[in-house]
A protein has these predicted regions:
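Phosphate/diphosphate ligand-binding glycine-rich loop within oxidoreductases
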Residues: 2-116
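Residues at the starts of beta-strands that form the adenosine-phosphate
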Residues: 5, 34, 124, 147-150
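Hydrophobic packing residues within well-ordered alpha-helices of enzyme cores
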Residues: 22, 70, 137, 141, ...
Length: 196
């Protein structure tokens, strides 16, 4: 039986539950995997990714701080990655010998909300942060038809380009984007309790 060489890269990485989750999933499905965590600094990212796949790697999960920078190491990008400018998975296509960047964050995020019976339709949504993880969930949130999407970041100057990207994408029919300075109109939302 084939053993798939997989891993998760980030910095730091010791806190990641990905190895445990993926190994349990592999046991449940009868797939053999070698899934390892790799702490990779930003300056070594491209070299690590190329070496991993050149030495038989099948796929990598990507976490902070590499979700944006990792796409530079990909030979091809999904339409979603081209739109959002971030990825959370790199897959080696053995037939074409190409590294493919994709993102499953948004669909996974929304599916988790659905499992908890949380609906986003016609609600106000607040996103804190404007990095790769935040940007990767915006299209999936838009598909849920919220009334408004509010977004803010510790560095306010980084938010405007994110807002403009999604407003200019031509498919934002799901309510306007606003910055946190407009929060006075952020009312009528469901509150998610800590510990859920």
């Amino acid at each position: 039986m084939r053993i798939y060489k997989l891993g998760v890269i980030g910095k730091p990485i010791g806190h990641s539950l990905s190895p445990k989750i993926h190994n349990l999933f592999a046991q449940q499905t009868g797939i053999k995997i070698d899934y390892q965590p790799y702490q990779v600094s930003p300056d070594a990212l491209d070299i690590f990714i190329r070496d991993f796949f050149n030495n038989g790697g099948d796929g990598l999960n990507i976490t902070l701080p590499h979700k944006i920078a990792c796409i530079e190491s990909a030979d091809d990008k999904s339409a979603l990655v081209k739109k959002i400018g971030a990825a959370n998975i790199l897959i080696h296509n053995k037939d074409s010998n190409k590294i493919i960047a994709d993102s499953t964050d948004g669909n996974g995020f929304v599916e988790d909300l659905h499992c908890k019976a949380i609906k986003l339709a016609q609600t106000n949504v607040l996103i804190l942060g404007g990095g790769g993880a935040a940007q990767s969930i915006i299209p999936a949130i838009q598909n849920e038809k919220p009334a408004n999407i509010f977004i803010d970041n510790r560095s306010p100057g980084k938010i405007q380009p994110v807002i403009e990207r999604y407003l200019s994408s031509g498919d934002n029919n799901d309510g306007p984007f606003s910055s946190l300075s407009d929060l006075k109109s952020f009312s009528g939302t469901s509150h998610i309790k800590q510990g859920m």
